[in-house]
């Protein structure tokens, strides 16, 4: 349980997937909430539709590695080419950051907490990505 939130396991996962362009600080934890209409229809079902990700930023792409609700790797990986990303916005709030962009005309709102209690690397990595302007190169 919660294996994908441990730094050693993340580094092992990077080696397994042979993604050499990933550094040790250019990833964060994030999630995509279900649409508001799902909350109106069936609240408990909407919570189950929440998608958790480890989000890796490279020069060529954004990689979304899906996690289950227990915080373990599911094996599903999405590679989003930076060439196909449009309308990229980054909004930093007090408790969470929103990364909003369009990919193939689909609007994605990725939310990421400023602090994750089980992952001390979250705040450090967010700060690193902001300083290096890695969210949009």
Protein language model regions, located:
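A membrane-cytosol interface segment of integral membrane proteins
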Residues: 130-137
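Phosphoinositide-binding peripheral membrane targeting modules
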Residues: 42-54, 58-100, 107
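Short, surface-exposed, charged/polar-biased interaction segments
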Residues: 31-35, 83, 106, 129
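Anionic N-terminal interaction surfaces
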Residues: 1-55
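Short flexible/disordered coil segments
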Residues: 17, 82-96, 119-129
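Canonical phosphoinositide-binding patch of PH/PH-like domains
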Residues: 105-125
